């Protein structure tokens, strides 16, 4: 049965063929964007491709050609595959600067939906951090800015509303990455209007299904999902195992795709943002945004496979 290694080997073969014969179909590395599932941002109706790109750790590299080369390929694969949403943060080391440089090098600044965060205490520090993000990302406005891990939430949301009114930010939101913070996210949502919530949700962390995701669906709040693989912990559980036959019913060809499709099958999810520094993993992840999604019975089988 196909697995992630099989997919990567097949992708490498097709890449070699494409280099030798550029008239051949480009497979997932230049997939038809219309094949990538899109979902609407409830507050505006604007549609986003369901597969985004996280940059935590993976984009925290030196700004030299050797370090940027694989990430350049990741970004080209991402954009050529019809995806748009890139999520970064000032606390991710060099990730913002690397993202900005790569977008400039690939001339894809106008194609990306840029999301970053504020993790500061006090309005002045929040504003300074926002301005530093603009400089690092080489832009004069951002699509989405989120209060990172609910740090000084009310102060920073007030600032973000000002920036939104000025046209410097299109959407605002809040984030967290642990299940124990879900009640805190809900408490903020009950009092503060936002466009987006970013949260952790995966086969191994399903607490969001109980209250947080239903609340967002009912109140028109877009959701971005982080930690879809739990920092690769979930993939390590199935390393070396072949995909079960029933995975074909979801059109998944790797365990990673199966994990992402599990998340996307929840209609309250707007997009998922797996991070990677590997172009072939990026192509693999994009495949999860195409084809069929698992129904309730198949989702139960996916959970069992990782238990």
Show where each model-derived region lies.
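A generic structural signal for well-ordered alpha-helical segments
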Residues: 78, 107, 164, 216-217
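Conserved, mostly hydrophobic/aromatic
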Residues: 41, 53, 86, 99, ...
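Generic structural signal for well-ordered alpha-helices
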Residues: 38, 75, 96, 100, ...
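Structured C-terminal cap/extension of enzyme domains
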Residues: 14-17, 23, 41, 211-307
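N-terminal binding-site loop/beta-alpha segment at the start of enzyme catalytic domains
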Residues: 2-110
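Glycine/proline-rich, positively charged
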Residues: 62, 121-207, 211, 218-224, ...
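Short, electropositive alpha-helical surface patch
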Residues: 100-107, 113, 284-291
């Amino acid at each position: 049965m196909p697995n992630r290694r099989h997919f990567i080997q097949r992708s490498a073969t097709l890449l070699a063929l494409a280099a030798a014969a550029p008239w051949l179909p480009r497979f997932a590395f230049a997939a038809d964007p219309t094949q990538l599932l899109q979902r609407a941002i409830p507050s505006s109706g604007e549609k986003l491709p369901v597969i985004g790109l996280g940059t935590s750790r993976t984009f925290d590299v030196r700004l030299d050609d050797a370090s940027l080369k694989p990430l350049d390929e990741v970004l080209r694969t991402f954009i050529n595959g019809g995806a748009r949403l890139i999520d970064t943060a000032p606390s991710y080391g060099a990730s913002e600067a690397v993202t900005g440089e790569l977008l400039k090098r690939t001339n894809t600044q106008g194609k990306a939906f840029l999301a970053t965060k504020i993790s500061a205490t006090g309005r002045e520090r929040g504003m300074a951090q926002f301005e530093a993000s603009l400089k690092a990302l080489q832009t004069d406005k951002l699509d989405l800015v989120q209060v990172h891990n609910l740090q000084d939430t009310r102060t920073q949301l007030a600032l973000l509303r000002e920036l939104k009114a000025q046209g410097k930010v299109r959407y605002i939101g809040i984030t967290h990455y642990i299940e124990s913070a879900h009640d805190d996210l809900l408490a903020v949502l009950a009092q503060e209007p936002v466009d987006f919530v970013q949260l952790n949700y995966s086969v191994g962390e399903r607490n969001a299904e109980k209250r947080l995701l239903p609340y967002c669906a009912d109140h028109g709040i877009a959701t971005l999902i982080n930690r879809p693989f739990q920092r690769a912990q979930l993939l390590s559980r199935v390393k070396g195992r072949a995909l079960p036959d029933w995975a074909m019913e979801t059109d998944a060809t790797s365990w990673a795709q199966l994990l992402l499709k599990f998340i996307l099958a929840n209609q309250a999810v707007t997009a998922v943002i797996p991070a990677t520094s590997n172009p072939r993993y990026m192509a693999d992840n994009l495949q999860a945004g195409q084809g069929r999604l698992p129904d309730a019975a198949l989702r139960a089988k996916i959970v069992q496979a990782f238990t």
